Amino acid sequence: MQKPRIVLKIGSSNLCNGKIIDKTQIKALAQIISELKMRFDVILVSSGAVASGHTTLHIDRNTLQNKQALASIGQPLLMESYREALKDYAIPTAQLLLVWRDFDSRKNTTFAKDTIDTLLAHNALPIINENDTIATDEMVFGDNDRLGAYVTYYFGAKLLIILSDIDGYFDKNPHQYDDAQILPIVHSIPSQALEQTHSPHGDFATGGIVTKLIAADFLLQRKCMMFLSHGRKLDVLRDFLLHNKQSSGTLFCPADSQGIKTLI
């Protein structure tokens, strides 16, 4: 019986501790991936190439040219960290670097999916990142949130898990309101939430949450799901996927779906 396919996306803020790669966090991620692979086919979308490169070459990360250079230095460092952590579980790692045009071309998308299918059939972990070395300011996915959504839909998964530095999607800005509450289940996203100005380094209201909502909206329109939770609280993910218990986080799912039960 074929396992359900899921995509796990982790942001750079959860992979670095200050200016160094957080090996403890990567080991924890490797452990939960090994557990998830007992029940699911897992694809990992990982940010962190630029941040990893910056641990070796301390140059300004805000210019496009420097960002591309740092990504070319950091990507092999990032992959080596994953390879080292996952070898204890006998899980081979594979690298795929993608850009927007890979999804504009049916041919490229098919080739990439065929490669992923083959890797999963042999228990390997496909690790996907945006190809920052050749990406431009006009053609970026946004901290890989939208890349994760595209990978989920085009490569045959039904659930995207985004591990972030927030606990979920709140009913109001938790940095401004002490009574802000996590919304456990969301079936639709208001258009005004998607139209906010966003930047990768903004605050909660105008920063990374917006790209996550755009990713969720993309998937909801295609009858797929997304789960948003904190990347440093992996027991939440473990409870959700392995014990059918939602202790925190937000599940974005179509109103007519049975949620996570469709995968378990």
Swiss-Prot record:
CDD domains: AAK_G5K_ProB. One of its GO terms (biological process) is L-proline biosynthetic process. Pathway: Amino-acid biosynthesis; L-proline biosynthesis; L-glutamate 5-semialdehyde from L-glutamate: step 1/2. InterPro entries: AceGlu_kinase-like_sf (IPR036393), Asp/Glu/Uridylate_kinase (IPR001048), G5K_ProB (IPR041739), Glu/AcGlu_kinase (IPR001057), Glu_5kinase (IPR011529), Glu_5kinase/COase_Synthase (IPR005715), Glutamate_5-kinase_CS (IPR019797). The keyword Phosphoprotein does not apply. Belongs to the glutamate 5-kinase family. This is Glutamate 5-kinase. It comes from Helicobacter hepaticus (strain ATCC 51449 / 3B1).
